Amino acid sequence: MKNKILFILTLLMILPLSSCYNKENREEILKVYNWADYIDEDVLANFPAWYKQQTGKKIRIIYQTFDINEVMLTKIERGHEDYDVVCPSEYIIERMLRKDLLLPIDTAFGKTPNYLKNVSPYIVEQIDATSNNERIAHHYAVPYMWGTCGILYNKVHVPLKDAQTWGTLWNRKYRGKLLMKDSYRDSYGTALIWAHRKDLEAGKVTVPELMNDYSPNAVAMVEKNLKALKPNIEGWEADFGKETMTKGKAYLNMTWNGDAVWAIEEAKNVGVEL
């Protein structure tokens, strides 16, 4: 059963919470909080000059990265960081809207006014599902990329027949050989999907319904399944899993499709089959 977990990354405008930059004009600073490896360093280095050429104004970029959505949210909420733009997964939008942490965005997009018209209606629908208190999510967030979560495996140690379902993660043949993504959303969803696999196959429930089920029974089921998974887990990773897999040091990695593609291509260069 090849059920996949959808994730959508978005760009958001953050409600200013503080502004202490001594003599520097805050309007001349662009603070960005993003996942690592998402924007090329050359783009960041060249942006101030490009911006000056386009607008006649100077800008300085403060660029910081995170590897876990909840860490990002905590830093903004409790640390009172006044980022201008952040890039969380879609389920975080609902929390940020509820906590009044976001500002509406200008959807004209400069020289690309048709940007939103070309976005998949399905993606916009998924984002708007996080709308809160009459605040339409796509008024506060712009789709940046989307993907799925799945299993990356070493072909030498894991035969194809073993890699057909989420149950691969619980297979005791791979004790101590599994890297799990350090993302509660993905781990939670994976555990529920596997637990309800028969209901999914029978059409009694959908993946989105499971992903948003936080009832006591669902939480208890996730706890039970993740505890059963523990013997197989070599470690929890937010970013290093793809490199570990390219070195052949782990057999399985529950990971995001972008990281999986990168790892597969890199592994070819060193003779590792993923």
Where are these regions (language model features)?
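C-terminal motif of bacterial Sec signal peptides marking the signal peptidase cleavage site
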Residues: 16-19
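A ligand-binding cleft/hinge motif common to bilobed small-molecule-binding domains
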Residues: 92-95, 252-272
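Extracytoplasmic ligand-binding site segments that recognize negatively charged/polar headgroups
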Residues: 38-41, 97-249, 263
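Early extracytoplasmic/lumenal segment of secretory-pathway proteins
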Residues: 21-99
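Paired acidic/hydrophobic, glycine-rich loop segments that form the ligand-binding mouth/hinge
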Residues: 83-88, 234, 251-256
